[in-house]
């Protein structure tokens, strides 16, 4: 393949993941002054600035994962399966941001994050069968998601008065 083709794929992959990342950042930053700042959080939750950059890092790594899967050849059924699982994982991650920061549904977001982790593990297994290099970028995302999930659980436990399914109208 031509170098331009790879460059185009890299840009497309990063943009495809950074657009949902922008949505996640928007949801995070708009909830900081209100709901999120009022939550009791465990001591290991980093400052809002660090979380901001961690979100960017996660979505950049997801973009590199997508690029690597794409370059493995979507015509192969194993790679296509990894690609579809990856898209499902990306969708669940964005849905977690919507659930947690927009709907303010910490318990529901915890369920979504557990689902995202389960699908990401399936994605990782599929990637190891078809596009091994993509695992380099996906494993740090999985580690960050496990930390987020644990923080989410602690927030649910520390803020017992939160509505289970989100904002109460």
Stretch-by-stretch model annotation:
Residues 1-15:
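N-terminal membrane topogenic signal
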Residues 2-5, 70-80, 128-136:
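Membrane-interface helix-boundary motifs at transmembrane edges
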Residues 17-33:
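Alpha-helical transmembrane segments of multi-pass membrane proteins
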Residues 41-54, 169:
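Short aromatic-rich membrane-water interface segments that cap or initiate transmembrane helices
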Residues 60, 64-97:
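Helix-adjacent hinge/juxtasegments
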Residues 96-108, 129:
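Membrane-interface helix caps and helix-loop-helix hairpins in membrane proteins
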């Amino acid at each position: 393949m031509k170098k331009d083709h790879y460059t185009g794929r890299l840009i497309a992959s990063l943009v495809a993941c950074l657009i949902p990342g922008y949505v996640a950042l928007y949801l995070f930053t708009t909830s900081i002054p209100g709901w999120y700042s009022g939550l009791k959080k465990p001591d290991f939750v980093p400052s809002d600035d660090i979380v901001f950059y961690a979100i960017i890092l996660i979505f950049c790594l997801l973009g590199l994962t997508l690029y690597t899967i794409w370059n493995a050849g979507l015509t192969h059924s194993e790679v296509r399966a990894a690609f579809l699982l990856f898209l499902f994982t990306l969708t669940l991650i964005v849905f977690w941001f919507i659930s947690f920061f927009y709907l303010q549904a910490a318990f529901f977001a915890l369920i979504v994050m557990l689902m995202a982790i389960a699908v990401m593990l399936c994605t990782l297994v599929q990637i190891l069968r078809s596009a091994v290099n993509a695992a380099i970028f996906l494993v740090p995302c999985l580690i960050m998601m496990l930390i987020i999930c644990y923080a989410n659980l602690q927030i649910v436990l520390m803020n017992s008065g939160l509505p289970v399914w989100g904002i109460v109208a």
